[in-house]
A protein has these predicted regions:
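A cross-family phosphate/adenosyl-ligand binding-site feature
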Residues: 1-59, 66-75, 82-143
Length: 143
């Protein structure tokens, strides 16, 4: 729908100047080596929210979060899920109650056609990163 995985890998490498970390073995050292100041999960799907909320580290994204959190460093979540106001709502609540999780401000993307769908305002990622690095959730969080 949004392009091939290979296209996005190349694009990320262009932007960052290094290849993306997309294997569990590549992200495991994030925590022990303190490789990141902040980890941004964007977009964060309902499936990923559930895994984070239940501490399931079975792929590179969730393993990166687990590894990064061991040092008490911030994880910034940019929600993008069709069931944010239904099934995924509980998982958002769990993460809000935990230390070191921060959210990019989010709201309903189409209340009439998709009443339970939530989407982060991706334009606010830089500001949300600054807040998270300072230990603060930017407000308003709900748009």
């Amino acid at each position: 729908r949004f392009g091939t995985a290979e296209h996005w890998k190349r694009k990320l490498e262009e932007i960052c100047g290094c290849p993306p970390l997309h294997l569990i073995s590549q992200v495991e050292p994030i925590g022990p080596k303190r490789l990141l100041d902040i980890l941004v999960i964007a977009p964060c799907t309902g499936n990923t929210l559930a895994k984070l909320a239940h501490s399931i580290a079975d792929g590179p994204v969730t393993m990166a979060a687990k590894s990064h959190l061991r040092n008490g460093r911030p994880v910034l979540v940019a929600v993008s899920t069709n069931d944010g106001l239904s099934g995924a709502g509980e998982n958002i609540g769990r993460l809000l109650a935990r230390k070191h999780y921060y959210f990019v401000p989010f709201g309903q993307d189409d209340p009439l056609k998709k009443p339970t769908s939530l989407i982060a305002d991706f334009a606010q990622i830089p500001q949300a990163m600054e807040g998270a690095l300072a230990g603060q959730q930017i407000q308003p969080m709900l748009l």
